[in-house]
Amino acid sequence: MVINDFTNTNFVILAHLYNEKNNENVIKTTQDEVADKLQLSRVTINKAFSLFVQNGYLQRDLKHVGRYYLTDLGCTVVENIRTLSVEVNMLSQKSLIK
């Protein structure tokens, strides 16, 4: 059992956005590009983006239509879940060895 068994599509999308951000946390990837890359529907991506904005993980760029910023909170969520994933996987490996 690994942490991926417990993460959902929204985290996969948020983690992808984290990987796509530049050093100013700007995400220049469009929702269509995210949908294609992750092989998810455009509707799924749009719902996730709306949820992320609502919860403070993403912020719309008011000067550029369709551009978003990953907030500090969004970055922290991804980093913490990734850290937790490593720890859970290490514990899982230890339990398999015993």
Task: State where each predicted segment sits.
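Short alpha-helical segments that sit at the start of domains
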Residues: 1-16
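Minor-groove-contacting beta-hairpin "wing" of winged helix-turn-helix DNA-binding domains
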Residues: 64-72
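Short, locally clustered residues in the helix-turn-helix/winged-helix DNA-binding domain
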Residues: 15-22, 82
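Short, charged/polar, Gly/Pro-enriched secondary-structure boundary elements
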Residues: 74-80
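A short alpha-helical element within helix-turn-helix/winged-helix DNA-binding domains
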Residues: 27-37
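Amphipathic alpha-helical dimerization/coiled-coil segments
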Residues: 82-98
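Short amphipathic alpha-helical interaction segments
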Residues: 8, 39-54
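A short, conserved structural fragment
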Residues: 53-63
